[in-house]
Curated annotation (Swiss-Prot):
Entry's Gene Ontology molecular function annotations: DNA binding; excinuclease ABC activity
Coiled coil ranges: none
Protein known as: UvrABC system protein C
InterPro entries (UniProt xref): GIY-YIG_endonuc, GIY-YIG_endonuc_sf, GIY-YIG_UvrC_Cho, Hlx-hairpin-Hlx_DNA-bd_motif, RuvA_2-like, UVR_dom, UVR_dom_sf, UvrABC_protein_C
Organism of provenance: Prochlorococcus marinus (strain NATL2A)
Residue ranges occupied by any GIY-YIG domain in the UniProt entry: 22-101
KW DNA-binding (keyword) present: no
Protein task: The UvrABC repair system catalyzes the recognition and processing of DNA lesions. UvrC both incises the 5' and 3' sides of the lesion. The N-terminal half is responsible for the 3' incision and the C-terminal half is responsible for the 5' incision.
Principal location class: cytoplasm
GO cellular component: cytoplasm; excinuclease repair complex
Keyword DNA damage: yes
Domain UVR, chain residue ranges per copy: 211-246
Length: 640
């Protein structure tokens, strides 16, 4: 049974608030469907939780929206505030509650990921964390992308590591093994344990433990030399030289090179803050990490503390430095210091330098944070100009925050697909992209109908909203956040503007589909024709008068081109799969199920063609007789 939000159930709220203990601990706020919205901690739970529901207490719009959805609050009492901090950090890390996300990793900043859950882990750059892969280890986010790529490239030259996600050949190693770049993991030429030991040494570089790594490699080199294994000793020597080259350009910028420090500073402007972390190890700058934060309801001390809690809860204890220099005094400086010391099992000091060389370093980090802030502000300003101009072109009431664009791709009706791309605040939001296979039986090889295809896609996209309205739901109230069911109904993806790639015909078919859904009065929809870059709006014959180079048109073209790229990529993928299947369809005795098994097992026609008889016959669900037919089809001169 779904619970009613507490603010609409005064009796239940009053009873709950009376019984809250005034002990330290954590509180977990949940919605009506028991989804976790927010995790918080407090030295006095009663005072903190009551503050959310106290009349006259001015809450930020974000927190106010959250409180309207809270239907249940779970309390966990701890012995002290330090335990509450540790528990809060673990809960946020495990559940990633929506309203806890104060920090935003800029998607331009990449991480280094090591997939420790794999038998032979990979190491690669990524801009997105894989939430379901709990054994993955991430380092970053790094600000200097070019330097990071160069570092990883050099590391893969120094240490033989897995180079490919999918093996190039099924039955033999590739050239990377022959030239010493890969230890032959595809054929298991190296044990998983030995390979992971190599990767642990690479991990030490990203942990800032290069001094330890040097000592380890020097001992190994001496051991190889004493055992007369001169080739192995030479390989380790090359690794040592390579590690030195990685950091030879770094300057000694702190007097005491024996101390490991992280320096954290920020720059703020309007409602956004840029936060930078400089990682100093043995006097060398080994990494620059960056975050962006919404600072509309938080002061500098709160943001810096949130950075520290967020960052150090995601690293191994060995990566926590003995000293952290911060730009401003933290809200709970002693508490955070004790928390980090407990994790590291060694004293961690958090200091605010006022003078001397340390203060100069803080100024340097602040300067870099400000440069990143100006970069992101320039991008936002450009997007705002484009969105504002588009609003004027289309005579919209408000600037469109979420814009969706749709395109159809096919060749004479074959492999017909559609794309949905989404721009939020003028920036591509790839996590919201969708692809559609056209299901209409009328669309087939030799017969295409872009109008019908587009109508089908729009109908499928908005049928949840149509059902909500048919059941008596008020879309306008929902979108204005006057209803607490916004997330509960999973109706949080309403676009402010829909753009159709096409002319008046495509637009008319979409409008007809929306009329059938009874959504035509709620949705802003336009089309952009390719030939003359004309913009059409519903029920108006003539295109709008625009200039090709005005900002709003540039945004529309960028959106349209992205939709076209996404659609044609999916179409080519589907066509390639069909062509593979069509070749296998020519083999007697192979039905759809066995073709699917073959492609899943061997991944390509080429691999099936090169497979030996024993490999084919051992494929699950195939059998010896079918393996004979396949082998004879591809190698008629060597009939079995």
């Amino acid at each position: 049974m779904e619970l009613t939000p507490l603010i609409r159930d005064k009796s239940r709220l009053s009873d709950f608030l009376k019984d809250i203990p005034n002990d330290p601990g954590c509180y977990l706020m949940k919605d009506g469907e028991d989804r976790l919205l927010y995790v918080g901690k407090s030295k006095k739970l009663r005072n903190r939780v009551r503050s959310y529901f106290r009349s006259g207490n001015e809450l930020s719009p974000r927190i106010s929206l959250m409180v309207r959805q809270v239907a249940d609050i779970e309390l966990i009492v701890t012995d002290n505030e330090s335990e509450a901090l540790t528990l809060e950090s673990n809960l946020i890390k495990s559940h990633q509650p929506y309203f806890n996300v104060l920090l935003k990793d800029d998607k331009k900043y990449p991480y280094v990921c090591i997939t420790w859950g794999d038998k032979y882990p990979r190491i690669f750059l990524t801009r997105k964390r894989r939430q379901r892969q709990l054994k993955d280890k991430y380092y970053g986010p790094y600000v200097d992308v070019y330097l990071l790529r160069q570092t990883l490239f050099s590391i893969k030259k120094l240490f033989p590591l897995r180079q490919r996600r999918i093996p190039l050949y099924k039955d033999r190693t590739c050239l990377n093994y022959s030239i010493g770049r890969c230890p032959g993991v595809c054929q298991e030429e190296i044990s998983s344990e030995d390979y992971k030991n190599t990767l642990k040494r690479v991990e030490m570089i990203f942990q800032g433990r290069t001094d330890e790594l040097r000592i380890l490699l020097e001992k190994q080199m001496i051991s190889f030399s004493e055992s007369l294994k001169f080739e192995e000793a030479g390989s380790v020597r090359d690794q040592l030289k390579g590690i030195d080259r990685l950091y030879e350009s770094q300057k000694m910028i702190i007097p005491d090179s024996s101390v490991c420090r992280d320096i954290i500073a920020m720059a703020s402007e309007e409602n956004i803050s840029s936060v930078q972390i400089f990682q100093m190890r043995s006097g060398k700058l080994i990494g620059r990490l960056g975050y962006f934060s919404d600072n509309s309801n938080f002061n500098s001390s709160q943001i810096l503390q949130q950075v520290i809690e967020n960052h150090y809860s995601n690293v191994d204890p060995v990566e926590i430095p003995s000293e952290i220099l911060v730009q401003h005094q933290l809200v709970n400086n002693i508490l955070i210091s004790d928390w980090l010391s407990e994790i590291k099992k060694q004293k961690v000091n958090i200091n605010v330098p006022k003078r001397s060389r340390k203060a100069e370093i803080i100024k340097l980090v602040e300067k870099n944070a400000n440069l990143e802030l100006q970069r992101i502000k320039q991008s936002q300003d450009k997007n705002l100009v484009e969105l504002d101009d588009l609003t004027n072109i289309l005579d919209l009431e408000n600037i469109p925050k979420r814009i969706e664009c749709y395109d159809i791709s096919h060749i004479q009706g074959s492999d017909a697909v559609a794309s949905q791309v989404v721009f939020i605040d003028g920036i591509a939001a790839r996590q919201h992209y969708r692809r559609y296979k056209i299901k209409s039986p009328n669309i087939k090889i030799g017969h295409s109908d872009d109008f019908e295809s587009m109508a089908e896609v729009i109908t499928r996209r908005f049928r949840r909203w149509a059902r909500f309205k048919e059941e008596g739901g008020d879309i306008d109230a929902l979108l204005s956040n006057e209803s607490s069911v916004l997330d509960n109904l999973n109706l949080n993806d309403w676009p402010d503007l829909v753009v159709i790639d096409g002319g008046k015909g495509q637009l008319s078919s979409v409008v007809a589909a929306l009329e059938g859904l009874k959504l035509d009065q709620n949705l802003n929809v336009i089309s952009l024709a390719k030939k003359k870059e004309e913009v059409f709006i519903p029920k108006v014959k003539q295109s709008l008068v625009t200039e090709s180079n005005q900002p709003g048109m540039l945004l529309l073209r960028r959106l349209r081109d992205e939709a076209h790229r996404f659609a044609i990529t999916f179409h080519r993928q589907k066509r390639s799969q069909r062509m593979k299947r069509s070749q296998l369809n020519e083999i007697p005795g192979l039905g759809p199920q066995r073709i699917k098994l073959l492609l899943e097992h061997f991944r390509s026609i080429e691999a099936i063609q090169m497979a030996t008889f024993s490999e084919l016959s051992s494929t699950p669900g195939l059998g010896r007789s079918t393996a004979v037919v396949i082998r004879n089809y591809f190698h008629p001169d060597k009939n079995i």
